[in-house]
Amino acid sequence: MNNTIETILNHRSIRSFTDQLLTAEEIDTLVKSAQAASTSSYVQAYSIIGVSDPEKKRELSVLAGNQPYVEKNGHFFVFCADLYRHQQLAEEKGEHISELLENTEMFMVSLIDAALAAQNMSIAAESMGLGICYIGGIRNELDKVTEVLQTPDHVLPLFGLAVGHPANLSGKKPRLPKQAVYHENTYNVNTDDFRHTMNTYDKTISDYYRERTNGKREETWSDQILNFMKQKPRTYLNDYVKEKGFNKN
């Protein structure tokens, strides 16, 4: 097993960072690593906003659900779906492509491009001995996040990425068994296979939480996920995404 694979398999989310900020060189390396990710048809439909202003980080921390590691980290990055530059290019050349930019396919392209870039950055950061934590909470109140970051139409903040020097290492959460996520040639809908896999995984997760909390928590993955799914969804996003110029047709 090489160092790259070891880094990937050793991933865990870090939610406690030291006060040490990333250097300009480290930030540059991380951004270059993100840019090296694959991109659909060379469109590069994403942007990264680095947030170093302490007040902006504090505001984003509150908007993300009062998550302290949004404010206290080595550097905070926000990954955005970005079709603004493409719209600007078209306008400068007298082309009219708004309807094309605002369709579902381009929305999906921008989402995937941003996610690929972010994962490249994450792996690069962890290979440098840094820790990372993805922050989906910025989608709680995207209209206010947009104000903080001053993003124009055709730019949509998707998630944050806190990066820094770990203050402590959390345990690695067991992932779903391979047979739950990998299907050969066709999707496996066998009910018995599903039930066996989920029961086995639920016991693994229950044992993990019991050991981690000295018996104070024994929640299964099934219970955890179903409870999460029943929480109030961000239903406003459907309209807001369209308002920002995405997924209109």
Swiss-Prot record:
Highest taxon, organism lineage: Bacteria
Tagged with keyword Flavoprotein: yes
Entry EC number(s): 1.5.1.38
Reactions that this protein is recorded to catalyse: FMNH2 + NADP(+) = FMN + NADPH + 2 H(+)
Keywords, alphabetical: Flavoprotein, FMN, NADP, Oxidoreductase
Pfam family for this entry, one: Nitroreductase
Gene3D superfamilies assigned: NADH Oxidase
GO MF entries: FMN reductase (NADPH) activity
Role played: Reduces FMNH(2) to FMN, with NADPH as reductant. It also reduces nitroaromatic compounds, quinones and azo dyes.
Assembly information from the UniProt record: Homodimer.
Family: Belongs to the flavin oxidoreductase frp family.
PANTHER family per UniProt: NADPH-DEPENDENT OXIDOREDUCTASE (PTHR43425:SF3), OXYGEN-INSENSITIVE NADPH NITROREDUCTASE (PTHR43425)
Additional remarks: Catalysis proceeds by a classical ping-pong bi-bi reaction mechanism. NADPH is more effective as an electron donor than NADH.
Protein's UniProt name: FMN reductase (NADPH)
Gene that produces this protein: nfrA1
